[in-house]
Curated annotation (Swiss-Prot):
Keyword Transport: no
Stated name of the protein: Envelopment polyprotein
Cytoplasmic-side segments: 343-459, 1066-1110
GO terms under cellular component: host cell endoplasmic reticulum membrane; host cell Golgi membrane; membrane; virion membrane
Gene from which the chain derives: GP
């Protein structure tokens, strides 16, 4: 009996739908070009329409797309076959049986059945797919903007704008045939996260609206989106060509959004639109700015005051008439009333006689707070609202109607009910009130090579022609160009890249020789082995600094092909990302102020001991005072970040299985060994079933009973968009990024618990108080696509245990641990009488990704991997103490004896003016003495106005905010206490770097807004209130700020006491009508009183006053 081919097809069940796959064709022993030709040959059909499986031992593959001679003998010469001449079932999906297997943001993965064979296809369009099963999931159209995959997990949270099916051609040992946009190739399918790609320029528009930017691109189409980190933006992509204006909404300006456009990313800074509009409208007028910014509060207060008095009068007048309403409201709020009255007996600031509120002085009212009896000491002992004793509580039942009426009618209860009524009426009233061209190669004059086209073209290039439009011949000593359109021949000197001897690596022809001449051997090799379908002519890659080779691979990524994961990760870095440069290093306006007193004097230096809690965002502004110095000197310590650095080792990557590709072969007779002759063992995920030919399960022309075998393998399609990388923890170290500013300049540095930081005048060290965060040495952690770290039950490498961590892959999706052979629990098979056999794959290898729900998220803050071996995890709690030792020479606090001499003065700046980022300046000079100095400069404000100059070389980092370019302007260095000794430093150079960030970078009002925020901050106001007590507090050393607070509290109480006395006297004077009562001075004298009739009365005059004793 002869072995016979079967039209086997595969039925794969995954999720809630079946998946069908075609036979795999395999010949992986030849190079990449021959593999594609092998696939094309297998698609040829014979005259009967039967698909033939070619015999590996006899098949011959010819160069230049030639196929072997036909077995029928009809042709005696090789025939050149074009790809377009081959039958392509993927393009005929509308007339064939097809099924949609996966839909991404940019393409679709579907399969078509033709003559009993299933073909896998990927397409960027939905043309002719309307009749396919599952077509209801298709969108109206796919996005056509250029994108490239994101293989670096850290970038997915910020840059991902959707998903796309890709073909990975680098995994040669696991490839299978696939068609992408009708182009056949061998590879593996993978679903990847993607980001925009392309040349895009982001610039601020010079119009009145300061929230509008302009986006410009030389490409035919480009995409942009304003994305909040971690959000899904696949349905918010906006495409454009040329240029477009974008106006940010108030929601976009919350400091958590990024503008993504092509290869660039720009963070939308935090901007309060209401504040910025007022700053611009009322520039340089802080009172109008304050009124404008807080207008809503002023308006609310004014309306509330206008509404309050009429409502108050109405409620007081109707409280007795509408007592039923108050009873109903009291019944609703009875628990609250009961609690308030109960707690009042324990309130310390109440009068012991009448029970009313008493702060300092108090005049008792006629009625007690219970509003029932007269106020007296005897009644206060009986009043249940004032006194709480066990005997009195027994007399009252809190659920009785008597107790209810008592609680409702107390002064506390009645005031509460009136307040609730006033609030409800107020809300009711207020609610009704209105409120370039891509990289090309030129021969000599008008003949070019353009990526994506395998023909020589002229400068009239529109699309890739069918034949050469010109020709470029590389000779030994010259280059000859022939233009077929103009019949002009030009000869020029040999100017190729030297030393490009690569004949053994490439197949030479005229075009390849020319490409090697202009770009070198490496590019010529990939040009021949990895062609481009679409050259993306307008894309230059200048933003990412791509050379010819890297630009070619980037365009391959745009075409849906991943060649090398390592190169792809390098392309993941985004240009123009001003995320860090926008953040102010030291936001000192929100820090508390302290006076710093020296701890000791060592070798003529004042030693200051500073201790700060190791907490992110904390800091202190220290003032250094000395009797000999005229002004206090400022020293700012800012703990910018506190985080734990974990050193890890990468174990593997795991990802969910999106679908499965299966190939198998059936024999009528024989065993597995016979089947394996046609379907060799691949090394993993192989299977073989025998017998598969028996009564009721035979194929046509097969009469065998209890014979035959079905063997094959399966390959998974992984969803790398949801991949996790598994690491093992090796080591943990606490690190802190600390910034200092003040008279020692401005700089940021990193302090580790292992290595202290020492520079200039200070030394910084960490006293760690590590909190256990659940991560231990040797523990496995998972880094997810959301940039968070997870811990839990995770399988170790090469461990088949049923825990999260399978399938185990390399970071590029290459299986590194899997089953060699599938057992009976992993698959099932079925057949029909005189029909086709089907294989159902239950599980193609280990799959435990669903167990990710059992993992625990370690931190709410996303982590950032610095490389594959370490990452940082920020902490929101204190990790210990930061200790700084500051040693300052005593000369800094003394008046200089002479005018200092500065030499080798250098002052250079770079950055922008009229922007919030400012100019970052580096100053250096050599001084002959040590002194403290003040800095001033016209048209500029400085990050620090005081510096400490030491004898010898000095270097400082300063930030200047200027209204104009300060180049060639003078900075005045004024020694402490004597302006006559001032020296000047000239600004040597200013490199203006206008960042491509937006809104506040080119805004002339940015500095004014910063100044307003600083002047109106809570800390500034609090410091202003305490300032009258600075003189007294300065005598208490390090308790300076504490003494100021204590004195302020005492002053407030004294003022309240005085005001209370004055108010009591005035109230009594008015209440007793003393201003109407005459004072009758009657000591020993008397007056004649009139008789009852009132007649004959004589009044005695008062004797004259005697002033002799005065």
């Amino acid at each position: 009996m002869a072995l016979k081919e079967t039209d086997a097809k595969i039925h794969v069940e995954r999720g809630d739908h079946p998946e069908i796959y075609d036979e795999a064709y395999y010949d992986r022993s030849v190079d990449h070009k021959n593999e594609i030709l092998d696939t094309l040959a297998e698609m040829l059909q014979n005259a009967t329409g039967k698909t033939l499986r070619p015999t590996r031992d006899t098949q011959t593959v010819l160069a230049n797309n030639e196929v072997p001679q036909s077995s029928s003998g009809l042709s005696s010469t090789p025939t050149t076959i074009s790809i377009m001449d081959l039958p392509n079932p993927c393009l005929n999906a509308s007339s064939l049986t097809c099924s949609i297997k996966g839909v991404s943001t940019f393409n679709v993965y579907y399969q078509v059945e033709s003559n009993g064979v299933i073909y896998s296809c990927i397409s960027d369009t939905i043309t002719k797919l309307g009749n396919c099963e599952g077509s209801s999931e298709l969108p109206r159209s796919f996005e056509t903007v250029p994108v490239v995959p994101i293989t670096k997990i850290d970038n997915k949270r910020k840059l991902s704008i959707g998903t796309k099916f890709y073909i990975i051609e680098s995994l040669e040992n696991y490839n299978y045939p696939i068609m992408y946009n009708s182009r056949p190739t061998n590879g593996t399918v993978s679903l990847q996260s993607v980001k925009f790609s392309g040349d895009c320029k982001i610039s601020k528009t010079n119009i009145v609206n300061s929230y509008t930017v302009s986006l410009t691109t030389p490409e035919k189409i480009m995409g942009y989106v304003v994305k909040r980190e971690g959000s899904d933006m696949s349905h918010s992509i906006i495409s454009f060509s040329g240029s477009v204006s974008l106006t940010f909404t108030e929601e976009n300006m919350d400091g958590k959004h990024n503008l993504l456009c092509g290869d660039k990313s720009s963070k939308v800074p935090l901007v309060d639109k209401r504040v910025r509009d007022c700053i611009i409208k009322y520039s340089k007028n802080i009172y109008k700015q304050t009124a404008c910014i807080n207008f809503s509060w002023f308006r609310l207060i004014m309306i509330a005051l206008i509404v309050y008095f009429p409502i108050r009068y109405l409620v007081n007048k109707t409280s007795k008439t509408l007592f039923y309403g108050y009873d109903l409201l009291g019944l609703i709020t009875y628990p609250i009333l009961l609690l308030i009255n109960y707690l009042w007996s324990y309130f310390p600031l109440k009068c012991k006689v009448c029970g009313n509120l008493c702060l300092v002085t108090h005049e008792c009212s006629k009625l007690c707070i219970c509003n029932k009896n007269k106020a007296s000491e005897e009644h206060s002992e009986e009043c249940p609202i004032i006194t709480r004793t066990a005997e009195k509580n027994k007399k009252y039942n809190w659920a009785s109607i008597e107790w209810f009426h008592l609680i409702v009618n107390t002064k506390i209860g009645l005031s509460f009910l009136k307040a609730v009524t006033e609030t409800l009426i107020g809300f009711l009233i207020l609610s009704q009130m209105p409120m370039s061209m891509a990289q090309t190669a030129q021969c000599l004059d008008s003949c070019y090579y353009v990526p994506g086209c395998d023909r020589f073209v002229t400068n009239r290039y529109d699309k890739c022609p069918e034949k050469d439009q010109c020709f470029c011949a590389i000779k030994e000593n010259s280059i000859v160009e022939s233009n077929f359109l103009t019949n002009v021949v030009t000869e020029g000197p040999m100017d190729c890249i030297p030393y490009q001897e690569c004949k053994g690596r490439i197949t030479e022809n005229a075009l390849v020789t020319f490409v090697k001449c202009r770009f070198g051997c490496e590019y010529a090799s990939i040009f021949q082995s990895k062609p481009l379908d679409n050259g993306f002519l307008e894309y230059s890659g200048d933003t990412l600094g791509l050379n010819a080779v890297n630009l070619h691979f980037m365009k391959r990524l745009r075409n849906g092909i991943i060649d090398f994961y390592n190169k792809t990760e390098k392309y993941g870095y985004i240009s123009g990302d001003a995320l860090k440069s926008n953040e102010s290093d030291i936001p000192e306006s929100i820090f508390p102020r302290k006076s710093l007193i020296f701890d000791s004097v060592i070798d003529g230096k004042y030693r200051y001991m500073i201790e700060e809690s190791l907490l992110s965002g904390g800091g202190t502004v220290f003032s250094l005072n000395d009797k000999s110095s005229s002004t206090a000197q400022k020293f700012v310590v800012y703990i910018k970040k506190v985080r734990i650095q974990y050193d890890v080792s990468e174990q593997y990557t795991t990802a969910p299985i999106q679908s499965t590709h299966t190939d198998f072969f059936s024999t009528c007779t024989g065993k597995c060994s016979d089947c394996r002759k046609e379907q060799p063992i691949t090394g993993y995920q192989d299977f073989c079933i025998t017998p598969t030919s028996y009564w009721g399960c035979e194929e046509v022309w097969c009469l065998a009973i209890n014979e035959g075998a079905t063997c094959g393998f399966c390959r998974n399609v992984y969803d790398m968009d949801q991949s996790f990388r598994i690491y093992s923890v090796i080591k943990s170290t606490i690190k802190s990024e600390v910034c200092i500013s003040g008279f020692v300049g401005a700089k940021c540095f990193t302090v580790s618990e292992e290595v202290p930081s020492e520079s200039g005048y200070f030394q910084a060290d960490i006293l760690a108080d590590f909190h256990n965060d659940g991560l231990t040495i040797g523990q496995l952690i998972a880094h997810g696509p959301d940039s968070h770290v997870y811990a839990g039950n995770i399988a170790r490498l090469n461990n088949p245990s049923k825990m999260f961590g399978h399938p185990q892959l390399s970071h590029q999706g290459d299986p590194i641990f899997s089953k060699k052979t599938l057992d009976t629990n992993d698959l099932s098979w079925d057949c029909s009488a005189i029909g086709k056999k089907t294989i159902t794959i239950k599980s193609c290898g280990y799959d435990t990704y669903r167990f990710k729900t059992g993992l625990n998220q370690i931190s709410d803050i996303p982590v950032q991997f610095t490389d594959q071996n370490s990452f940082y995890m920020e902490k929101i709690f204190s990790l210990g103490k930061l200790k700084i030792v500051l040693d300052l020479p005593s000369e800094l606090f003394k008046t200089v004896p002479k005018k200092p001499i500065l030499s080798s003065v250098s002052l250079s700046c770079k950055g922008c003016f009229l922007c919030s980022q400012g100019l970052r300046c580096a100053a250096s000079f050599i001084s002959d003495i040590t002194f403290s100095a003040r800095l001033t400069m016209k048209q500029c404000s400085l990050s620090t106005y005081q510096i400490a100059v030491k004898k010898g070389a000095n270097k400082y980092n300063l930030t200047m905010f200027c209204t104009s370019n300060p180049e060639k302007q003078k900075m005045i260095i004024e020694p402490e206490g004597d302006k006559s000794y001032s020296v000047e430093a000239l600004v040597d150079s200013v490199a203006v770097l206008e960042p491509e960030n937006i809104i506040d970078q080119n805004d002339q009002h940015a500095h004014e807004e910063q100044q307003y925020n600083s002047d109106t901050s809570v800390w500034s106001f609090w410091d202003y209130v305490k300032s009258p007590f600075n003189f007294i507090a300065s005598h208490f050393g390090s308790f300076f700020d504490t003494v100021r607070v204590v004195l302020l509290i005492l002053f407030v109480f004294a003022l309240a006491y005085l005001c209370s006395i004055v108010a009591t006297m005035c109230r009594g004077y008015v209440r007793n009508k003393s201003y109407k009562t005459k004072y009758i001075e009657d000591t020993n004298d008397y007056s004649l009183v009139s008789t009852s009739s009132g007649k004959d009365t004589i009044t005695r005059r008062r004797p004259p006053l005697d002033f002799s004793g005065i």
